[in-house]
Amino acid sequence: MGFSPSFSCSAIGALILGCLLLQASNSNAQLRPDFYFGTCPFVFDIIGNIIVDELQTDPRIAASLLRLHFHDCFVRGCDASILLDNSTSFRTEKDAAPNANSARGFNVIDRMKVALERACPGRVSCADILTIASQISVLLSGGPWWPVPLGRRDSVEAFFALANTALPSPFFNLTQLKTAFADVGLNRTSDLVALSGGHTFGRAQCQFVTPRLYNFNGTNSPDPSLNPTYLVELRRLCPQNGNGTVLVNFDVVTPDAFDSQYYTNLRNGKGLIQSDQELFSTPGADTIPLVNQYSSDMSVFFRAFIDAMIRMGNLRPLTGTQGEIRQNCRVVNPRIRVVENDDGVVSSI
């Protein structure tokens, strides 16, 4: 039996589903959930089955694919520029500080692209593959289903410098987080709080945690917002001057499940990285009521997350004749140039 996103629709309800379909269809005039119905009807099956297979040996991959989509969209829009390798024309975004030695899942996207090129040659963009993969990853981890607006095309360049400045840092305070989100067009408080909920599964490296354990903001003391018991545990996992690449679960309770436990953790002072805990521990912040609400009612979080994901997925998409449909997600397509020799013979090179 092939993978299908439809099995979870009844859980959402017909009325909500209808509203979401309308919202997704109207969110960008040229993107629509049924974009591949006629040209590649099994695109969800192909991508979903590969993720199911990958999860058997790599439980982290679902969170990694969601993060990859997030890091793509925050840099000049959702155009798969993050997937491009180095070339003579540009430096890859994979080398940027927020991605280097931490962004992962590229080989899985490659596998999806190969399978889709066999089934539907030249039809499905890498940008849409990444968008669909993030949605299915959330679904397979216990999260909601939503209609994904599709029809994006792929960038023909990468943006290394922008990737170094546009992506939110794990060391950001709340003001910096809001600015980073607003700069790309996500200016609702619910965008920030709901999308941060993507840290309800997955891992982070100790190098992004240790400053708040030992020398928070140069104080030579730990972050005072940290739960004391949690601080002891994190110091055990991430000793001072230890291996910065050691992985720690974002969520100590349900580390591989997409649920609302992340927000409960924040309320208990158990946010793993500074930028997460800032949502609840910043005095008087307008993010606090949303953290409380999402912690208390997972369905409210799921609805907010769906809305924010659709909004993020529609950041500056390339559509129509813009960009291209890459044959290989790691490189731009060969440029075809028509030339005429001295004898009047025309050829392509």
Swiss-Prot record:
It catalyses: 2 a phenolic donor + H2O2 = 2 a phenolic radical donor + 2 H2O. InterPro entries: Haem_peroxidase, Haem_peroxidase_sf, Peroxidase_pln, Peroxidases_AS, Peroxidases_heam-ligand_BS, Secretory_peroxidase. This is Peroxidase 22. Disulfide bonds join 40-120, 73-78, 126-329, 206-238. Its cofactor is heme b; Ca(2+). PANTHER family: PEROXIDASE 22-RELATED, PEROXIDASE 72-RELATED. Removal of H(2)O(2), oxidation of toxic reductants, biosynthesis and degradation of lignin, suberization, auxin catabolism, response to environmental stresses such as wounding, pathogen attack and oxidative stress. These functions might be dependent on each isozyme/isoform in each plant tissue. Pfam families: peroxidase. Residues 1-29 form the signal peptide. It comes from Arabidopsis thaliana (Mouse-ear cress). Substrate binds at residue 168. There are 73 peroxidase genes in A.thaliana. Induction: Responsiveness to high-salt stress. It is found in: Secreted; Vacuole. PROSITE patterns: PEROXIDASE_1 (PS00435), PEROXIDASE_2 (PS00436), PEROXIDASE_4 (PS50873). The modification Pyrrolidone carboxylic acid is found at residue 30. GO terms for cellular component: extracellular region; secretory vesicle; vacuole. Ca(2+) 1 binds at residues 72, 75, 77, 79, 81. Ca(2+) 2 binds at residues 200, 251, 254, 259. Binds 1 heme b (iron(II)-protoporphyrin IX) group per subunit. Binds 2 calcium ions per subunit.
